[in-house]
């Protein structure tokens, strides 16, 4: 059986998050950036299974980090399962985008679980075991939001049916009130399976890179959001700026 260390990258001390926030909670998942939230149906309903799909370097992780920042502002606990980030690199990235979450991390409102599997034997049985461990942790965790960044690596060593079963279990957990965000590369599944994956999820955000003028920009398409306050189908063009994070590019400028 595979061994996966689900010990978080911080001590998880207890305190009232409202003491850090200084304001009342808001029961919707937002990025903490009003300009971006307007484009994603005024925020994503809590209790949703959210798919963030895109190729390499399209801003999937950056978007989840904005969600983490918004979650802290809205009195929500977050568990982040990352296949790439260490505690140090996570905090450094957040700081580089002026998303200061160090106090929340120190108090345990954000917990980072490292999925760096050193000297790990990649087998379908082992990967299925890891997926089961993750889903059980999410089910019994006191976190309001779970982020899996990314699911792609697991799809390479296990069957697509096993991943679909994982997503179905995740959807059942969301029906009980938890919110789960999953990032995934578009190439991870066949077209038929990808259609099934998208249908399971309550929200589907598609991240792309587009050449506009003489430069590439990132584009977020809101494909669907069940229970959204506003209609979906919006396209958001943005760049990632050091010291600022996601910066919306007006359509008129993006087309120049």
Locations of regions flagged by a protein language model:
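Phosphate-binding/switch region of NTP-binding enzymes
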Residues: 184-245
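Short hydrophobic/aromatic beta-strand immediately N-terminal to the Walker A/P-loop
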Residues: 50-53
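Phosphate-binding/switch loop-helix module in NTP-utilizing enzymes
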Residues: 115-175
